[in-house]
Amino acid sequence: MKSFSRISGVILLLALIAGGIFYWNPLWVNDQQIRYHLWRAGVHSEYVEAGGYRLHYFEATPPDGSPGTPLVLIHGLGARGEDWAAMIPSLAAAGFHVYVPDLLGFGRSARPDVPYSLPLEENDALAFLDAIHLQHADVAGWSMGGWIAAAIALDQPQRVDRLVLYDSLTLKFDPTIAQDAFVPTDKASLDRLIAVLSPRPRALPGFVIRATLRKFHRTGWVIQRTMDSIFTKKDALDDRIAAIRQPTLIVWGAEDRLIPIAVGEATHHDIPGSVFVSVQGCGHLAPGECPKPVLAATIEFLKAQPPMHGGEETLPGVTK
């Protein structure tokens, strides 16, 4: 009986500790769950020295042991490699050797005190490709990552075989939110940011809101410096994007309130032979919120022989 009581006490203590960890650091707990899911799916977490800094990245290979077609996924502003979690295992299973870096200043990569900007992150992505000895690959970018992917396709076209842009920051447009909105300081400003990112935002518990605001307080300076670069619009690709010659897929959430679908349509118009797919019911976070149609369009495009050329399609959104 005493032994049972001791075991029960230990279990209760562990439950209290686990509950306390989740309450005080829910974002960390969520990250561990995502990383465990990726690990179970055969996705490896790695580090590499690139451009003088330590960068974290995920790597996944086809389960059949084949080399796989190299595919690099580049995340957006304020994001990290984990944001591709809904797509990485499926892309590897489809025959791709997937590399997913955390850009400089984000995720588990180094966060040096430097003047963050779009060109700096492009150089960081190129340094990553050099560090892992990847001469060329299919390259996909989401939001700010789309700018980086498109810029690489223009500046070093031999490095990009096929290009995929998801709700991408490619052309000039009038922002729907203020410059400082990406670094919320209270519940009201966080609610406004979430409402712009997702057409159907979920209500967050108070302890999750507080943890999220603490994270923005710690790392928001990187986002703000990058936003300073973005809002000048001096690095917009309007005058260059028509020079992209790689087969290009453009995927857009039809309800994107951050970068309106009109930007995607204009990008499609400007890139010769590009394929445009809009996903109904999805917003700026389409690859994460609606991974099934986004994955289907991506895999079909990247595996097509000969490469797909031109065309438009609308897909129904399928939320997780």
Q: Where in the sequence are the language-model features?
A:
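Alpha/beta-hydrolase fold catalytic core
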Residues: M1-T69, A93-F96, K303-K320
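Conserved alpha/beta-hydrolase catalytic His-Asp/Glu region
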Residues: W24-V29, P184-R245
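Active-site loop/oxyanion-hole signature of alpha/beta-hydrolase fold enzymes
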Residues: V48-G51, F58-T61, A93, V100-A140
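Conserved HGGG/HGGXW glycine-rich cap/lid loop of the alpha/beta-hydrolase fold
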Residues: A60-R108
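Conserved hydrolase catalytic core segment
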Residues: Q135-F173
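Short beta-strand/loop motif that positions the catalytic acidic residue
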Residues: I244, I250-W252
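Acidic catalytic loop of the alpha/beta-hydrolase fold
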Residues: E255-I259
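Catalytic active-site module of serine/aspartate enzymes centered on a nucleophile-bearing elbow/loop
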Residues: S274-V275, G281-K320
